[in-house]
Amino acid sequence: MSLLTEVETPIRSEWGCRCNDSGDPLVAAASIIGILHLILWILDRLFFKCIHRRFKYGLKRGPSTEGVPESMREEYRQKQQSAVDVDDGHFVNIALE
């Protein structure tokens, strides 16, 4: 006799479980956690690009400019832009002496 026939048997035209511990709170908690894990995994696969792009680039917004005068903000922007212009898409080699 297989395990399948011992556990799942047709009862009144539907499948039922003859497990004695099916009302155990631990089993219910494990089922809920399993279902939540499956839902989160599906959402992660559906929105992979959005979620991971948010974590990867969303946290790198640069220093806060709150309370900094506008002239200093503009100076900072110009420094950042000049650093990008100098690099021009190539690696910068730094020689240590």
UniProtKB/Swiss-Prot annotation:
Name of the protein in its database record: Matrix protein 2
GO MF term list: monoatomic ion channel activity; proton transmembrane transporter activity
Keywords: Disulfide bond, Glycoprotein, Host cell membrane, Host membrane, Host-virus interaction, Hydrogen ion transport, Inhibition of host autophagy by virus, Ion channel, Ion transport, Lipoprotein, Membrane, Palmitate, Phosphoprotein, Signal-anchor, Transmembrane, Transmembrane helix, Transport, Viral ion channel, Virion
Membrane topology recorded in Swiss-Prot or TrEMBL: Single-pass type III membrane protein
Quaternary data: Homotetramer; composed of two disulfide-linked dimers held together by non-covalent interactions. May interact with matrix protein 1.
Region (Disordered): 60-84
Sugar-modified residues: 20
Stated role: Forms a proton-selective ion channel that is necessary for the efficient release of the viral genome during virus entry. After attaching to the cell surface, the virion enters the cell by endocytosis. Acidification of the endosome triggers M2 ion channel activity.
UniProt gene name: M
Residue numbers marked as site, Seems to be involved in pH gating: 41
Spans traversing the lipid bilayer: 23-43
Localisation per UniProt entry: Virion membrane; Host apical cell membrane
